[in-house]
Amino acid sequence: MLKDITIGQYYKEDSLIHRLDPRVKLFAVLIYVITLFMHKAPATYVMSLLFLIITIKISKVPVKYILRGLKAIAVILLFSVMINMLFIPGKPVIQFWIISISAEGIRTTIYLGSRLIMLVLGTSLLTFTTTPNELTDGLDKSLGFLNKVGVPVHEIAMMMSIALRFIPILTEELQKIMKAQTARGIDFESGGLLKRVKSMVPIIVPLFVAAIRRANDLAMAMESRCYHGGVGRTKLKPLKYEKRDKIAYIVLFVFLAVMIYLSFFSPWR
């Protein structure tokens, strides 16, 4: 399960998506998330899925690597499916004892499940194709206007970047601890759910200690380099829009217009 946690990890590749300005990719994620919650017809789900598939193909990130991240949300997805199928009222199509599953429940489950899957895959693609430094610069530039009203944009962007960077680091640390505990005879794989949960208890304290140690090392490194926020900082590689970024913006606005039409004006809605 631990090796399936891919969120926050950067996949190094030379693709058009990787070369896009991080501000474009942040805007793309925003547009994609907004359109996911606009879905009102099967055509909108098909369009969102098609857009995601094309983007993944262009990014050159292996499909297996991207889909691996879905295992981390399998429990949430399963819980959502069960709740919607069992508790949404309607004309029953499956009746067993006190369990009743309606056509509306099945339809809602399919819609919500596909929406959650596309949401996770779409947002994960941002971290797969954008380094933490690029993500920080992109957020800093995109939300820079909030500095005028006293919002510490650079600090917020830095915290988000550090949090994303810590996910794979802590995952690696957890794997090391589990291997050490396995060498001492603890079995994490066999047994029921309750037994597996109990077997995880001995690794909680070492993991917290490792996390605190890593955070302290990072704080000392930043302090030794005289980090004092974004005031007066310069960039080694300043962000600059290229022709491909402008074309990407046009594609995103066209996609948004199509989704608005399919959601509110199309005869298929």
Predicted region positions:
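Membrane-helix interfacial "entry" motifs
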Residues: 14, 37, 60-65, 96, ...
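Alpha-helical transmembrane segments and their membrane-interface exit regions
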Residues: 51-61, 76-79
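Alpha-helical transmembrane segments and their helix-start/interface "positive-inside/aromatic belt" motifs
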Residues: 25, 63-74, 248
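Transmembrane alpha-helix interface motif
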Residues: 1-44, 48-57, 144-151, 155-158, ...
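Juxtamembrane/interface alpha-helical elements of multi-pass membrane proteins
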Residues: 74-186
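Alpha-helical membrane-interface segments at transmembrane helix boundaries
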Residues: 67, 71, 107-111, 201
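Transmembrane helix-loop junctions in multipass membrane proteins, especially transporters and channels
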Residues: 41, 45, 60-64, 88-96, ...
